[in-house]
Amino acid sequence: GRRFFVNGQKIYVTGGNYINSDWLLRLSPERYRDEVRFHAEMNLRMIRVWGGALVERPEFYNACDEFGILVFQDLWGSGDCNGAWEDPTKMDSRERRWEYPDNHDLFIASVEDLVKMIRNHPSLCFWCGANEWPLAKDIDQCLRKEVFPRLDPERLFVSFSTDTLFTRNFLGDNGDGPYGIQEPEWFFSFRSHPFNPEAGSVGSPEVESMR
């Protein structure tokens, strides 16, 4: 794991992922503020902007500043689409998909614009290259060695959300499944050092779906 300090005071990080609250983009400053406020009212301290969705608008970060919510900021990358798994529905080979996105220069330029847009928000805690799996090697190296040292040198950058810099969680498992429910006592008898970017939970289906 890693320790986090705010104004010199060590904090215990709790939080959740934020994945586009409205895919039709019917977003407003009021809606952003309400959703971040809900996060704060649950006594959560960090919110992760997940890499398979949007980078949010300044109004989102303004709300995080207001309510004291730290932001774990992913870039646009998700292990679901960059060749990490065999996928018979994809026309491109796995090797080709390792190089997604197609235009690396445009991706880097977009990251530079993003950094300039939100780097002055005190809520922004650290940068993460992608969800679960690193970006193409040349992009990752450019971000690590050139973009972030030049544009936001004081903040941490990790290549992907399950980077071993953050998590060596072998109990919850960083593998590809199949997944199941862990026995509760395991969490007290098995030593683990996680900073989990996400965790599965049991959801209750609606009654109508079971009739």
Give the location of each predicted region:
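Substrate-binding/catalytic cleft of secreted carbohydrate-active enzymes
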Residues: M46-R211
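N-terminal carbohydrate-binding accessory modules
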Residues: G1-E41
